[in-house]
From Swiss-Prot:
It catalyses: trans-aconitate + S-adenosyl-L-methionine = (E)-3-(methoxycarbonyl)pent-2-enedioate + S-adenosyl-L-homocysteine. Pfam families: Methyltransf_25. Keywords: Cytoplasm, Methyltransferase, S-adenosyl-L-methionine, Transferase. One of its GO terms (biological process) is methylation. The gene is tam. It comes from Escherichia coli O139:H28 (strain E24377A / ETEC). This is Trans-aconitate 2-methyltransferase.
């Protein structure tokens, strides 16, 4: 599990793209020239940006070679760069920085977010969506299984919170629109939940384990999911998935 798996990630493409669609709908920009898609993955969010602004120069940035290769294949009209978001520098100031489900993986948001704002043109927009599920059973159970099996904590840090992000971006000179939405995804089985998180949140926990260790981890994780996520009357499982949305417009 040394690299991201585009096919596994796209297995739930509709569910993963829906927050990007809703974030994009709140971006108050019309004719723009320069766009960056931070953590573009296989290009599903980049495609939405290209559809809305076909004449813009859109650059997707991702640290995964596999994801970048998939995105380049799918969107030859866009530019893609394999790079760390924290170190990447655009060639010119940007009109829009779009980050759908990527910045939660990076530390030091008190420094990162003002840095990203500094890359914008005046009236430019930073649009961010981040999973806010650190306290959801899916993620709590990852930590519990790791503790039971004596593995180190490899989960990401919790988000800073609504009030913190508002203050960070306001102090950076932005007008801020911020909201939180909980999606309830219909999952056919507990294994489907595992398939979902294996492509994202579960990766850090599994990537350094042997195959047998991964099997033991996932077996216990599956047992604990069954305890926390009951079946509905029709046999489906409702997976609650909170997400935090931010649209910050640089007013300088």
């Amino acid at each position: 599990m040394s690299d991201w798996n585009p096919s596994l990630y796209l297995h739930f493409a509709a569910e993963r793209s829906r927050p990007a669609v809703e974030l994009l709908a709140r971006v108050p920009l019309e004719n723009i020239k320069y766009v960056a898609d931070l953590g573009c993955g296989p290009g599903n969010s980049t495609a939405l940006l290209h559809q809305r602004w076909p004449a813009a120069r859109i650059t997707g940035i991702d640290s995964s070679p596999a994801m970048i290769a998939e995105a380049r294949s799918a969107l030859p009209d866009c530019q893609f760069v394999e790079a760390d978001i924290r170190n990447w520098q655009p060639e010119q100031a940007l009109d829009l920085i779009f980050a759908n489900a990527s910045l939660q993986w990076l530390p030091d948001h008190y420094e990162l977010f003002p840095h990203l704002v500094s890359l914008l043109n005046p009236q430019g927009v930073l649009a961010v969506q981040m999973p806010d599920n650190w306290l959801e059973p899916t993620h709590v159970l990852m930590r519990e299984v790791a503790w039971e099996q004596n593995y180190p904590d490899r989960g990401r840090e919790p988000l800073a919170g609504v009030h913190a992000y508002y203050d960070i971006l306001s102090e950076a000179g932005c007008e801020v629109d911020i909201w939180r939405t909980t999606y309830y995804h219909q999952m056919p089985s507990h294994q489907a939940i595992i398939d979902w998180v294996t492509a994202t949140g579960l990766r850090p926990w599994l990537q350094d384990l042997t195959e047998s260790e991964q099997q033991l981890f996932l077996k216990r994780y599956h047992q604990m999911l069954e305890e926390q996520y009951p079946l509905q009357e029709n046999g489906q499982i409702l997976l609650a998935f909170p997400r935090l949305f931010i649209v910050a417009r640089r007013m300088e």
